[in-house]
């Protein structure tokens, strides 16, 4: 009887221990890290309309129209720590919902603040963008302040069509250009998800998945719109 009781208690202990471990794993999978040295606190999304002028001897205006979405991610230190940001990697970009018109490109900053993307041509949609920790934010050099800062990138929707006109008018790059092409909001809406990996100076990495719907709904009417996203309850960071 005593031997049976010992075996029963032993196996009961094993079962309880396994249940506790399983509960911890499930809870971590659902909630992620409770205490992060750095976290994503805000995303600023700016949706606008751009155009590239084509030389055309027959028309005053011949403009290739592009809808662009600038993304600025704010990374803040969340606790008293001596850790700093070593690097932040944006990877595994996935188009969850493709637009009906246009082709998506992902661009990195290559210029100063006044012309961040003027010379940006390489498409990073099937690649990754890595910001190194530095003294200050420098998007052109892909550097983010190592105590927290802002990083940026752009999703552009190219090949929407050409605006051709012989009116001697000033061109305003806003939603009217999309209207003139007969482009509707529903035709250019798309959704992209990607992983953000924050690596600290202690070589500890935390990964979360972010999803962004673009462009902002008011782009057709307002032409240039911005939106702040601060609810990240669905972005779960885990150690990797």
What are these regions (language model features)?
Residues 1, 198-200:
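Hydrophobic, Leu/Ile/Phe/Ala-enriched alpha-helical segments that form helix-helix packing faces
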Residues 1-17:
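N-terminal Sec-pathway targeting helices
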Residues 16-27:
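Hydrophobic alpha-helical membrane-insertion segments, chiefly the h-region
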Residues 25-187, 201-240:
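Non-catalytic macromolecular-recognition regions in eukaryotic signaling proteins
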Residues 190-198:
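Short, structured surface segments that line ligand/substrate-binding pockets
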């Amino acid at each position: 009887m005593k031997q049976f009781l010992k075996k029963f208690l032993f196996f009961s202990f094993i079962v309880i221990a396994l249940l506790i471990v399983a509960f911890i794993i499930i809870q971590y999978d659902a909630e992620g890290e409770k205490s992060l040295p750095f976290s994503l606190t805000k995303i600023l999304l700016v949706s606008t309309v751009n155009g590239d002028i084509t030389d055309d001897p027959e028309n005053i205006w011949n403009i290739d129209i592009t809808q662009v979405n600038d993304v600025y991610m704010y990374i803040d230190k969340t606790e008293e720590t001596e850790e700093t940001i070593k690097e932040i990697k944006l990877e595994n970009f996935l188009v969850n919902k493709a637009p009906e018109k246009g082709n998506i490109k992902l661009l990195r900053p290559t210029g100063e603040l006044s012309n961040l993307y003027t010379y940006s041509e390489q498409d990073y949609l099937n690649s990754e963008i890595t910001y190194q920790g530095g003294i200050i934010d420098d998007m052109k050099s892909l550097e983010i302040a190592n105590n927290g800062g802002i990083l940026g990138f752009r999703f552009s929707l190219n090949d929407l069509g050409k605006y051709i006109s012989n009116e001697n008018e000033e061109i305003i790059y806003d939603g009217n250009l999309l209207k003139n092409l007969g482009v509707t909001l529903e035709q250019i809406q798309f959704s992209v998800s990607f992983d953000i990996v924050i690596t600290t100076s202690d070589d500890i990495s935390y990964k979360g998945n972010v999803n962004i719907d673009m462009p902002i709904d008011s782009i057709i009417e307002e032409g240039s719109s911005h939106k702040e996203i601060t609810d990240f309850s669905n972005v779960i960071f885990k150690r990797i």
